[in-house]
């Protein structure tokens, strides 16, 4: 079977899932003939993906999300304005996607939550069937729990999710745990897509806490938590750290962002502190490491992940770096 990928390039989650499925399909004897990755003028295809993906990678413009530069909070209004301003190049992108599909004639297009896919199939109707994969399709499941209130964010999330999957033959909803399918919504619930690099790790019972610190305010909160609990060993992977290891004191060390090293540390830690991105929480759960999930401000999707993760028993959630809450959650 010849497969063409279409991937949202925002963040690491969907790209990482695509790498995982690429590995699985190759091992099963199928041919992944290429990947179309949605990018913006400010964001190209990440090197970690292009270096690991063995088939041709084609970047195509797609409107991106807008985040507050200081707080990293999602800005829905600015995101909408940006999408309106880029309507003309977006239409060109849809025609590019349609032409690539019709020229390469794969047996199936697999769409990892990229709006280019849903809109191309809605407006230009390629002849090749499309299957969509993402945790976000759990939003169409009757058992999926959302934050109370926040009507605007809930509707925006569902509309955005629907725009990615117009014309799809089936929606594969990645889930923390086993759930029944939703045939009326074309939703089939499937396990998370984990990279071979994760499944090959051999976890041990560690004593240190591991934190992935990308939000600007999270490092400040980590330092405050460290002052309150100086006896707890913590390792923090921080986007502002340039050295592999930057020791603060005997129980706190910061590390430069390094995906391979982070996984190695995860396999040896006691628990992790991270944003509520689906992929990292799933990797921690697979390795038996409870998570303190801290959703990004105004990021409705991550707020949903945090609620769903707590329901599935993979960790606990907080709006801040609440070390006491994580300690109380850990088995005694």
Q: What are these language model-derived features?
A:
Residues 7-19:
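A short, glycine/small-residue-rich beta-strand->loop->alpha-helix junction that serves as a flexible
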Residues 9, 27-85:
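Conserved nucleotide-sugar phosphate-binding/catalytic loop shared by glycosyltransferases and other
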Residues 109-112, 264-304:
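A donor-sugar binding/catalytic signature common to diverse glycosyltransferases
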Residues 163-168, 314-332:
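Leloir-type glycosyltransferase catalytic cores
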Residues 72-108, 115-116:
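Conserved nucleotide-sugar donor-binding subdomain of glycosyltransferases
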Residues 128-189:
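Active-site-proximal region of nucleotide-activated glycan assembly enzymes
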Residues 191-268:
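Donor-nucleotide binding loops and adjacent catalytic segments primarily
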Residues 37-43, 113-116, 174-179, 236-245:
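Short, polar loop motifs at secondary-structure junctions
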């Amino acid at each position: 079977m010849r497969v063409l990928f279409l991937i949202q390039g925002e963040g690491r989650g969907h790209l990482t899932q695509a790498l995982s499925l690429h590995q699985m399909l190759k091992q099963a004897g199928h041919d992944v003939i290429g990947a179309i990755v949605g990018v913006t003028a400010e964001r190209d295809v990440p090197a970690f993906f292009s270096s690991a993906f063995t088939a041709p990678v084609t970047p195509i413009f797609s409107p991106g999300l807008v985040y507050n530069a200081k707080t990293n909070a999602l800005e829905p209004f600015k995101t909408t304005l940006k999408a309106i301003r880029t309507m003309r190049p977006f239409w060109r992108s849809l025609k590019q996607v349609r032409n690539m599909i019709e020229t390469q004639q794969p047996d199936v297009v697999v769409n990892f939550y990229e709006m280019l896919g849903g809109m191309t199939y809605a407006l230009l109707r390629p002849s090749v069937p499309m299957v969509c994969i993402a945790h976000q399709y759990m939003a169409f499941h009757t058992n999926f729990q959302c934050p109370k209130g926040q009507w605007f964010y809930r509707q925006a999330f569902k509309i955005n999710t629907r725009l990615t999957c117009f014309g799809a033959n089936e929606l594969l909803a990645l889930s923390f745990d086993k759930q029944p399918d939703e045939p009326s919504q074309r939703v089939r619930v499937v396990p998370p897509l984990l990279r071979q690099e994760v499944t090959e790790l051999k976890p041990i019972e560690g004593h240190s806490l591991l934190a992935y610190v990308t939000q600007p305010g999270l490092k400040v909160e980590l330092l405050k938590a460290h002052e309150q609990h100086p006896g707890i060993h913590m390792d923090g992977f921080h986007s502002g750290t340039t050295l592999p290891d930057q020791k603060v004191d005997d129980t706190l060390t910061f590390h430069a962002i390094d995906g391979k090293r982070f996984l190695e540390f995860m396999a040896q830690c006691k628990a992790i502190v991270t944003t509520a991105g689906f992929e990292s929480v799933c990797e921690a759960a697979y390795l038996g490491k409870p998570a303190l999930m801290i959703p990004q401000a105004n990021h409705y999707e991550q707020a949903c992940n945090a609620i769903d993760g707590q329901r599935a028993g993979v960790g606990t959630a907080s709006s801040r770096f609440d070390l006491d809450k994580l300690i109380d959650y850990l088995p005694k």
